[in-house]
Amino acid sequence: MLPRGRPRALGAALLLLLLLVVGFFLFGRDPEYGLGTTATLDGDPYGSRNRSTSSLQLLLPPKCEMLHVAIVCAGYNSSREIITLMKSVLFYRKNPLHLHLITDAVARNILETLFRTWMVPAVVVSFYDAEELKPLVSWIPNKHYSGLYGLMKLVLPSVLPLSLARVIVLDTDVTFSSDIMELWALFGHFSDKQVVGLVENQSDWYLGNLWKNHRPWPALGRGFNTGVILLWLDRLQQIGWEQMWKLTAKRELLTLTATSLADQDIFNAVIKEHPELVHPLPCVWNVQLSDHTLAERCYLEAADLKVIHWNSPKKLRVKNKHAEFFRDLHLTFLGFDGKLLCRELFGCPNQFPPGVEQLQQALAQLDEEEPCFEFRQQQLTVHRVHITFLSHQPPPPRPHDVTLVAQLSMDRLQMLEALCRHWRGPMSLALYLTDAEAQQFLRFVETSPVLSARKDVAYHVVYRDGPLYPVNQLRNVALAQALTPYVFLSDIDFLPAYSLYDYLRASIEQLALGRRQRKAALVVPAFETLHYRFSFPNSKAELLTLLDAGSLHTFRYHEWPQGHASTDYTRWREAQAPYRVQWSADYEPYVVVPRDCPRYDPRFVGFGWNKVAHIIELDAQEYEFLVLPEAFSIHLPHAPSLDISRFRSSPTYRDCLQALKEEFHQDLSRRYGSAALKYLTALQQSRSRA
């Protein structure tokens, strides 16, 4: 697997090198800085504070020493930021990492799934509940936009394991352009009394001269910025850090109403009183791009940059002389394929996450010359998954509520706005995207008034990996994240009737599915139009008129009639009440089922039989199929996907699909015994007809 990803990784490395060269010409030739002098801020009263790391003799840690990093992360936005931060760290790192993540419930749910599916070697992740820390800092008034989470770095020494001696603490809005090992090595320059390493604040905030009557917290000179911190934890315990910062904060709050910069104000107040505790770090380890930054005095040339800190509320939109260069560096990692960072640290033992070695062994046993190799490989692929990629407000619990579940790729984004107009209830959608496409999708939603207004739609990004579309894996991701008792298993190219959401909830209640524990799959009849523009029917009566006029058709009536034949459209035309239908070969209706229904079979990738296998599973588990008389959904025309084109043109593709069908039936026989015989018989009959 490594040789296949190497050209892409090399390309990304060359792009970063190009950015550094451009930066040299941007910064290195500017006479304001000069190439032969050391960058300082106002004469650098601490001497070594602003020296580039290259001017220090680094005491690098052993090759396989574990480096510990602590990050406070809460909410949906920070959960996206931390991924870009980690990409930049992983790109340069040469040491194993142990991440200590202080998270709320939202971030933990997202990041546990992400790191479990990312499967990066030599990375250990531990989680700590931020809710348990809130009482420790909730007494501190804070005006900073980060709220209570912005104060939690103060209590890290009492939260992290006692066995942990040192830790690097990072904000989520920083980007590395160097090996984090070099930052860790700066612990070796601490004196015996120094317990915290910080970069000087690169603005005049703590000088109190930014505007009239500006009264900041006390600080030593310009003060220090806490976006990047080296904490010597056992020394902090020895000096009574908890009592020290609390006494300082309580004293200052007698005259200052609140903190403005969260933990940073309190760190600076303590350092003002105890300057011997701080070890000033070279400024290049925290180049701060705030609204009033003086950071350009720090860097001499692009190669000096170690960490970029987007510490303005405006983030990437901040005004800065060299903002475009910094943004390009950040955007490089934003769109970088995270799969390419799953490389081994050669020579370091015990570095694989659980399951990786077994997966590698299974992949190694595959024969690349075998005709169905792509199918076998895709089945074994573990995709990175970022659940709830955007802000999400779950609906309040209701006993008969229904979530629409679907999956899509980048070429179907245009369906989302129409779908939101048709379906008023919650949705759980899985999107198959590259890292770069995920950022395009983010901007697409943010700029759409329709999509940005819908907070009950949960988007889950499954990152692309492999040549075949993992349709059932995507469905399972979306299904697993549905929060309502029932789910409508649909496809992205279908628009449901405007009234379908309310009608489904009413039908579930009338049929008493919940009270009777009835195993039922409610069938939503599927239709299609071949016109890109048509008047969507508001009722069953209008739909029948369009059907009779030839503007609508039963779904796939001319290509795959057996797929929906059991729905019995002739009976549906006159039906006034739900009616039961029997399973038949190749039946694949769109159904409403309980959330805990069987999952889709992930072996089916690409085109063909992915829904059919799921309906067989429902029938094998004795679900009854009930067709709803007033429900309908209409498929809109679109260009054929790559997978359906391959299915139509490649005999090998069709042979591989047939092999998957046979394996599926063998598994059915093992699980259901003689009850599964009817499915195998139906398969053999359909094969003889073909």
UniProtKB/Swiss-Prot annotation:
| Pfam families, per the entry | Glyco_transf_49 (PF13896), Glyco_transf_8 (PF01501)
- GO BP term (any one): protein O-linked mannosylation
- Residues holding Mn(2+) 2: D491, D493
State one molecular function term (GO).
glycosyltransferase activity
Cofactor requirements of the protein: Mn(2+)
Give the span(s) annotated as Glucuronyltransferase activity: 343-686
Q: Which residues are glycosylated?
A: N50, N77, N201
Q: What EC identifiers does the entry list?
A: 2.4.-.-, 2.4.2.-, 2.4.1.-
Q: Where is this region: Xylosyltransferase activity?
A: 67-342
Indicate which residues the UniProt annotation says bind Mn(2+) 1: D171, D173
User: Can you quote the record's cofactor note?
Assistant: Binds 2 Mn(2+) ions per subunit. The xylosyltransferase part binds one Mn(2+) and the beta-1,3-glucuronyltransferase part binds one Mn(2+).
Kindly list the GO CC terms recorded for this protein.
Golgi apparatus; Golgi membrane; intracellular membrane-bounded organelle
The record, for CDD domains, names: GT8_LARGE_C
What domain of life? Eukaryota
Its UniProt entry gives the catalysed reaction(s) as: 3-O-[beta-D-GlcA-(1->3)-beta-D-Xyl-(1->4)-Rib-ol-P-Rib-ol-P-3-beta-D-GalNAc-(1->3)-beta-D-GlcNAc-(1->4)-(O-6-P-alpha-D-Man)]-Thr-[protein] + UDP-alpha-D-xylose = 3-O-[alpha-D-Xyl-(1->3)-beta-D-GlcA-(1->4)-beta-D-Xyl-(1->4)-Rib-ol-P-Rib-ol-P-3-beta-D-GalNAc-(1->3)-beta-D-GlcNAc-(1->4)-(O-6-P-alpha-D-Man)]-Thr-[protein] + UDP + H(+); 3-O-{(1->[3)-alpha-D-Xyl-(1->3)-beta-D-GlcA-(1->](n)-4)-beta-D-Xyl-(1->4)-Rib-ol-P-Rib-ol-P-3-beta-D-GalNAc-(1->3)-beta-D-GlcNAc-(1->4)-O-6-P-alpha-D-Man}-L-Thr-[protein] + UDP-alpha-D-glucuronate = 3-O-{beta-D-GlcA-(1->[3)-alpha-D-Xyl-(1->3)-beta-D-GlcA-(1->](n)-4)-beta-D-Xyl-(1->4)-Rib-ol-P-Rib-ol-P-3-beta-D-GalNAc-(1->3)-beta-D-GlcNAc-(1->4)-O-6-P-alpha-D-Man}-L-Thr-[protein] + UDP + H(+); 3-O-{beta-D-GlcA-(1->[3)-alpha-D-Xyl-(1->3)-beta-D-GlcA-(1->](n)-4)-beta-D-Xyl-(1->4)-Rib-ol-P-Rib-ol-P-3-beta-D-GalNAc-(1->3)-beta-D-GlcNAc-(1->4)-O-6-P-alpha-D-Man}-L-Thr-[protein] + UDP-alpha-D-xylose = 3-O-{(1->[3)-alpha-D-Xyl-(1->3)-beta-D-GlcA-(1->](n+1)-4)-beta-D-Xyl-(1->4)-Rib-ol-P-Rib-ol-P-3-beta-D-GalNAc-(1->3)-beta-D-GlcNAc-(1->4)-O-6-P-alpha-D-Man}-L-Thr-[protein] + UDP + H(+)
Those parts of the protein on the Lumenal side are: 29-690
Quaternary data: Interacts with B4GAT1.
Q: What is this protein called?
A: Xylosyl- and glucuronyltransferase LARGE2
Q: Which organism is it from?
A: Rattus norvegicus
Q: Which gene encodes it?
A: Large2
